[in-house]
Amino acid sequence: ILIEPDKNEYIRLKKKYKKFNDIKVFKDGIAEKDTNMTLNIFENPAMSSSLNRKNISPLFWGERKSQIRIKKKVYIKCKSLDNFILSNKLQVDFLKLDVEGLETKILESSNKIFKTMLGIRSEVSFADIFGKNKNDPGSFVDLHKKMIENNFTLLNLDYDGKGDYFSEYLISNSRYGVLQNTDAVWIKNLSFIFRLNDEVKLFKIVSFLILNNAYDLAIFILNKSSSKFKKYKSLDKTNLYNFVKISILKHLYKLKWIPGQKISNHKKIFEKIFGEKYLSMNEYNENVEINPY
């Protein structure tokens, strides 16, 4: 499900995904409540927002300054996240939020989504990009509090030590700049996960972990739950199972070149989890699921 209030972006997305029957694009805005809002369309459409954006990032002080100039204003109809879910009869497992400053208000007014949601990725700020005063701490603090209250754990941040830089006098492969915003990822906490009696939900969580660079936790959960779900044999004909199995196999295969890793341990953990033969050497390279071309 993709939600886009900007007409031009909505048309672009509809065209991009028109061949995908399982992808739906909605021309809606999401806000803290059902309302009409003014959307500021920036020269860089990806930064468009209903809020006034402060120019505090040095990345937009030079030749990129024009990107945060308002090109036009459009009026949009918005729904609360809960009402959007209700009106479209959705059950949301995962959520990606990038609404240029409204993330906190949207989630603080949402309750229904937390009854089904297993993981979330959201843009977060650590500076007063959209704040009204100089002491605004950004959105991360309030978002993290909301997630903790709903039994979520912070998985990771996309931040890799490379922030918004203030001059060219830096070493590109080192840490530099100031962290102003990034994406944060949360998942349901482990106590919730290990209480699950639904292996489909478990595999959805594991898939989310894989897609968010958390193979260690994915393998830990699969290993701990393998006996409970009888090596997941009820799922072994599904695309979900196959995605997880092949992803874990590829990950373990890459580890063999890292000092201290043992292929025998990779074989042991894979076969314990899935109850299938661990492929190595030519068996791995010749497998059409792993290397289809």
Tell where the protein language model's regions lie, with residue ranges:
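Phosphate/nucleotide-binding beta-alpha loop and adjacent structural elements of enzyme active sites
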Residues: I1-Y293
